[in-house]
Amino acid sequence: IKDPAPLATLLVDPAVLKVLHSGSEDLEVFQRWLGVLPQPLFDTQRAAALLGLGFGLGYRALVQEICAVDLPKGETCSDWLQRPLTESQCEYAGLDVTWLQRVWRELHEQCVRQDKLQWVLADGRDATSALGTEVDGFHRRIKTAWKLNRRQLGNLVAVCQWREDTARSRDKPRSWIIDD
C-alpha cells in the first residue's frame, strides 16, 4: 500500500462496520502503522464465544462450523513478514477473506436473534479502548502475572519490554521472540 491514508479513513468511519477474527494483533498493527483503531468493530471469535459456539474458536474451525468448508492450513505457519508474499500465501489469504463475510452474516444474524449484537459491539469498543490506553503494559497479557510478588513482577515487566523492543527492531511478532 503506497498511501495508507484511505485505509486509515475507512477504519475510523463510524458508518462502516469492521469485521475481524481474533483481531488483537491486527489492532496493534493498525495502531502502530496508521495511528488509528477501527470502530465499530465486530470480532467473529468473540461473537462465537458469546453465542456459545466455543471460547477461542480458531478461524478454520469457525468456517467449518458455519460454512461446512474445510480450509487448508498449509500456510498457517509460513513467514507472513517476507515480501513479496508467495502465490500460495495470497491464495490462502484470499480464502480467509472469502469466507469471513459469510461467517459474519451468520454470527450477526444469531446475535440479533439472541439480542447480543450490542454485547459484541461493546466488546469491540472495549478491545480498542484497552489498547488505546495501554502504555507499555505488555506484561498484563501474561495470565499468571497476578501470582507474582513485586520483584518477580518487576522482572516480568523488564522481560516483556525487552521482548517488545526486540520484536520491533527485528520486525517480528512478539511470540517469535518469546511466547506468552
Predicted region positions:
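Short acidic-hydrophobic catalytic motif
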Residues: 163
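Mixed-charge, glycine-rich, non-catalytic linkers/tails in nucleic-acid processing enzymes
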Residues: 87-160, 172-180
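Conserved DEDDh/DEDDy metal-dependent 3′-5′ exonuclease domain
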Residues: 1-110
